């Protein structure tokens, strides 16, 4: 149970990083360059809205934006299961580490999955500002520099 809770917390924290980056990038950009908000009734997924904002803010090309969209789709899927769980139980699934049948969410929130999602968040904490400094709009450069400087100790710890 401690691994389940810790994994869930790490995954939600990773999603919160992307939410904070979304909000910070909206603060930096002029209104004409902002991605549309969800309030337009489009029903767009949160991961797609965040992807579009980060694409515009950090100057991502379509291929890199596609990679980010794929990662964010998974991050938000895991986050949504933790924050907005279904009240119904589905069929039991085999836990990848314990080898026993468990409720689906118990199999989702493992150390391995948390590690992958945290590493993805840290990778994008480095990738996005690095690209932003080189090819992003000038309004994002201060935020990009701050992210690279503030997170440098984390990069060193996770890249070894």
Predicted region positions:
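Polyanionic, low-complexity intrinsically disordered segments
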Residues: 71, 87-160
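Short, solvent-exposed segments of well-ordered alpha helices
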Residues: 1-12, 66-73, 104-111
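Amphipathic alpha-helical interface elements
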Residues: 1-45, 130-134, 138-141, 145
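Flexible secondary-structure boundary motifs
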Residues: 20-100, 111-124
